[in-house]
Amino acid sequence: MERKVFSKDGKEIGTINLDDRVFNIEISHGSIYNAIKNELSNLRVGTSSTKTRSEVRGSSKKPWKQKGTGRARVGTKRNPVWIGGGIALGPKPRDYSYRLPKKVKKLAFKSVLSLRAADENSFKVIENFSVESGKTKDLALIIKNFASFNGKVVILLGNDDQMIKRAGKNIRDLKILSFDKLRVVDLFYAKNLIALESAVNKLNEFYIK
């Protein structure tokens, strides 16, 4: 699949080949869902904790005798029914992370790349560039040629360019990711996806193995 390549000024300068085995496969929505669920689960800290009736502070003495008072029978004021009592079936610290099969993860990445590549308006390929000044305004001027800032924007790099990443730190809703450190959730929810030529070439090689 051929796609137009633009200069950083927004002018068309050529074309690039998007490998059909990566950018034009039958989309597996199930694998995308499972990958996003896995990524978000792995981010959870899992530190929520409540006290049971055995852990909450207070006496275990029976508040009143079992019979003869006319009131409901109670064994302890730490009863979950009472205010200040323990919590029944409340959360405890746990690890929410789990591993996703490699084949499912790989299929999810290729599916989401194919989904994004199908829309030429939100997926742009531009020439390789660097922001030597490391200044936010210089990067913002380039991005404005391809995307508006009223939604999430993701830039895909072919290498770990620290100057571009530095320039993008102060731009809201912008994520700058290396081709080998992508997340399906970022690609799926981005309003605009900007890929450098080097990133496309690396993705072509990386996901056809």
From Swiss-Prot:
Coiled coil: none annotated. One of its GO terms (molecular function) is structural constituent of ribosome. Keywords: Ribonucleoprotein, Ribosomal protein, RNA-binding, rRNA-binding. The keyword Lyase does not apply. The keyword Transmembrane helix does not apply. One of its GO terms (biological process) is translation. It comes from the Bacteria. GO terms for cellular component: ribonucleoprotein complex; ribosome. Residues 47-72 are annotated as: Disordered. Residues 59-72 have a biased composition (Basic residues). Belongs to the universal ribosomal protein uL4 family. NCBIfam families: rplD_bact (TIGR03953). One of the primary rRNA binding proteins, this protein initially binds near the 5'-end of the 23S rRNA. It is important during the early stages of 50S assembly. It makes multiple contacts with different domains of the 23S rRNA in the assembled 50S subunit and ribosome. Part of the 50S ribosomal subunit. This is Large ribosomal subunit protein uL4.
